[in-house]
């Protein structure tokens, strides 16, 4: 049986990061039962959260703690990830390469230049390497990193990335041939996600679900006209403190609750790539903000633009926003997604056929 390791951003307490790791693991399990996520944390101090989760589950009743909702991400990791031992920046270089037959790097923005780490290029591993939907995110690779990218990627058997912009950058700057594939969250059917949803109590239907990651932008101003006529309850997650004035912020929600909220919302408003992806999968109307200004040195809008290039989202009548199902019907979306999904899955299948 082929033994596979995955190196990705699996434990950043981020909805999209957790769900892309879940999705890629689920797809790989179609080809082998032996798949593990390498439990790497880039801080020298190893996190202990996963070590205490079993203990918390046992004492929860004693202290009247519902630890699954108090630690929703830990619950998700515990239930859906098979992890290796923990590694940090010092110990990852002692990784036993003989413990796996293949390393998959991806997905998510593990190759973002502003967060560059040789670990996410698999430089700790001596063996067969491929990438799946790894994202550079930015519109450039700094000159001082070009050789690092080139030298690392020349050791890969196959390089696939999430955005066409990354294909261009790797070709033009590094001389590396890469293929553009779907984010792994788009490879699973929506029914797969419905199976792991967890309901959120005390929400009146219909409701608007907001999911914002930008801490600076004041989105309410741009939605003023729509919100003034909205009688729905507005709930969600935002990193911006002031947003609590118009959004009822939900506490203790993790990936399973996030899926339920998207599924049951009358409308989704987001600046998140994966917020956009799951709105599409659940066939939801969504308003999508571009989180970054065009001149921002860490502009990551290429992710949203990739969805637009597929025809999945289009320019909204609300200035500056994208909107789902404005340039295509649900039926057209599913047809095009099916074509792109088959193409992306063929790359994964090809990896295992060559083993």
Model-derived regions: residue spans:
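Active-site anion-handling motifs in enzyme catalytic cores
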Residues: 1-355
């Amino acid at each position: 049986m082929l033994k596979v390791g995955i190196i990705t951003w699996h434990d950043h307490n981020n909805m999209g990061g957790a769900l892309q790791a879940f999705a890629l693991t689920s797809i790989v399990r179609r080809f082998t039962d032996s798949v593990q996520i390498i439990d790497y944390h880039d801080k020298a101090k190893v996190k202990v959260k996963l070590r205490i989760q079993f203990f918390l589950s046992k004492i929860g009743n004693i202290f009247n703690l519902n630890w699954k909702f108090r630690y929703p991400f830990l619950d998700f990791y515990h239930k859906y990830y098979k992890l290796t031992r923990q590694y940090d920046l010092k110990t990852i270089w002692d990784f036993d390469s003989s413990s796996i037959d293949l390393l998959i790097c991806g997905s998510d923005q593990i190759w973002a230049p502003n967060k560059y780490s040789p670990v996410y290029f698999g430089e700790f591993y001596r063996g067969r390497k491929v990438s799946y939907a790894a994202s550079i995110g930015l519109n450039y690779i700094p000159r001082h990193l070009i050789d690092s990218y080139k030298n690392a990627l020349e050791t890969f058997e196959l390089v696939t990335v999430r955005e066409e912009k990354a294909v261009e950058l790797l070709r033009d700057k590094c001389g590396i041939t890469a293929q553009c594939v779907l984010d792994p969250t788009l490879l699973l059917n929506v029914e797969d996600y419905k199976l792991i949803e967890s309901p959120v109590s005390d929400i009146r239907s219909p409701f608007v679900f907001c999911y914002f990651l930008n801490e600076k932008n004041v989105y309410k101003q741009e939605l003023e006209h729509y919100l003034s006529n909205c009688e729905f309850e507005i709930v969600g997650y935002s990193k911006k403190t002031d947003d609590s004035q118009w959004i009822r912020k939900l506490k203790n929600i993790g990936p399973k609750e996030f899926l339920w909220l998207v599924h049951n919302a009358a409308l989704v408003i987001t600046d998140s790539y994966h917020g956009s992806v799951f709105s599409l999968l659940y066939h939801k109307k969504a308003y999508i903000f571009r989180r970054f200004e065009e001149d921002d040195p860490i502009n990551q809008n290429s992710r949203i633009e990739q969805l637009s290039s597929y025809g999945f989202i289009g320019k909204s009548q609300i200035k500056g926003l994208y909107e789902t199902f404005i340039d295509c019907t649900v039926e057209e979306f599913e047809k095009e997604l099916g074509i792109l999904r088959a193409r992306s899955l063929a790359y994964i299948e090809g990896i295992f056929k060559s083993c």
